[in-house]
Each structure stands twice: as structure tokens, then as C-alpha cells.
Amino acid sequence: MEIIAVAEQTVLVNQNVLFTDTVTCGNCSISHRSGSGLVTLRGITDQCRARFKVSFGGNLAVPTDGTVGPISISLAINGEAVASTTAIVTPAAVEEYFNVFTAIFVDVPRDCCLTVSVRNTSEDDILVQNANLIVERVA
């Protein structure tokens, strides 16, 4: 599944990037509601677990009324940011965009569900544009 949000959006501290359009639909083990920041992964498998690769790419900036400094974004599982997926940039001015990318493998136990999202882990609000989230069932 590939979901995107092309338009610039302000993402508040500890909130999720919202995805508005589905470019490529997933299968029955991946679901997303348009306008939501959550993707549900389902452990539909005969094995012990289902494995997914979750990749995010997008452009980040400090809003016009924000304070210039480091900004960051992370992938989150069930609402908890995964530290190893944190992408950090330090713009020199407001509305100066940087491109970031991060990815993770997520194992979902058989017959369970997890949610994944892209979370603003900065100390201030951020701008996100051309957000692209790809979720692939790999095993």
C-alpha cells in the first residue's frame, strides 16, 4: 500500500502526519482510512507472525511562526515512537525544507493487529509536505 499527502500540513508536537490519498491499495492485512494518520497491520498468517516493511519519505520544515532548530520525525508502532527510525534535520531558516527517509520491519503476531504512524517527535510544530508512506507485506 502506498499512501500520500502532497499538500503542506502543520503537524503538532507528538501528533501524526495525516495521509489523504491512496496511490496503491494494499491487501486485506493492511488498512488505512483516508485523512487518518494510522495504518493498521493485521497478522493474517499461518505462521507465527506476519512481517511488514514500512517506509516513509517526505519534506520537513519549521513553520513561519516557529523557532529555528532541530526538528524530527519518527515511525511509531501503537503510538510509541521507535527511536531507531528518528530522522533529524536542522534548518537554518523557517520554511527551509529538508527531505527525510526512514524505514523499519514490523512483525505482527498471528491473529493480532498493530498500528503504525509517522509522528512529530520535535519539541515544536513542524511542516510536512509530499509525505509518502509505503507499507509492504514481505513475509
Region roles according to the model:
Residues 1-139:
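Extracellular jelly-roll beta-sandwich "head" domains, especially the C-terminal globular C1q domain
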